[in-house]
Amino acid sequence: MKLVNIGFGNMVVSSRIVAIISPDSAPIKRFLSDAKTRNELIDATYGRKTRAVLVLDSGHIVLSALHPETIAARIEGGDKEEESY
């Protein structure tokens, strides 16, 4: 199981991530609103601006303050911030 740091010490299992997308478009904002009403939204931004939306295979949505490119690099590159168990 490989964990990836999505900011502020929060970790997500990398194999469960289906997509990493930018939150700026109107369809994504509606998607986030729907997830919030279903109680499937996890906010890991610590009050910062949301810069990436992670869609998990369980249907949960995770908000991160890191850029999508940063998270993708951590998943692919084996950054120091991630841990393997």
Curated annotation (Swiss-Prot):
Transmembrane segments: none
Signal peptide boundaries: none
InterPro entries with a match to the protein in the record: RemA-like
PANTHER family: REGULATORY PROTEIN SSL2874-RELATED (PTHR38449:SF1), REGULATORY PROTEIN TM_1690-RELATED (PTHR38449)
Family statement drawn from the similarity comment of this UniProt entry: Belongs to the RemA family.
Protein name: Putative regulatory protein DICTH_1339
